[in-house]
Amino acid sequence: MKIAVKKSCRNLSELPQELLYKILGLLPTRNVVSTSLISHQRRSQFHWMERLKFRYPRLLLDNRVPDAENEAENLVPGPSRCYHEDPKSCIIQEQIFLPYTSGSFHVQTRISSQRLIHNQHRKCQLRCVVQLSSFCLLSLQQIRLQRC
């Protein structure tokens, strides 16, 4: 694809949009945001860039993420972001290590809640349905454990 560029262009923001999308599509999102190219006039520009979807079978409640170098194969191109995507559901299954020796706990989210009873090894299986949209994923920090 050939794109004509004016010789007077001194800033990235003066480049044609097609070329700018190509350049920004090669950068990580954090770097794109730090360039401040996404100004008020280009606020929705990142919705047209390809995004990476992180596939990892276990989501950890303490927000630890796997080492990026070892988990690079779990990053796969996902669908492009747009406002008309339908919300999707996914099931998150996680082990919670509880500091108590007996009793039951109630796991509550904004969407669904389920009663958990831990076993001899003091761990529970958390299985909840979380509604996903193209913009937000319910944070695991929002899951509250309450002792019954």
Curated annotation (Swiss-Prot):
InterPro entries: F-box-like_dom_sf, F-box_dom. It comes from the Eukaryota. Residues 9-59 form the F-box domain. Pfam families: F-box. This is F-box protein At3g55900. It comes from Arabidopsis thaliana (Mouse-ear cress). The lineage of its organism: Eukaryota, Viridiplantae, Streptophyta, Embryophyta, Tracheophyta.
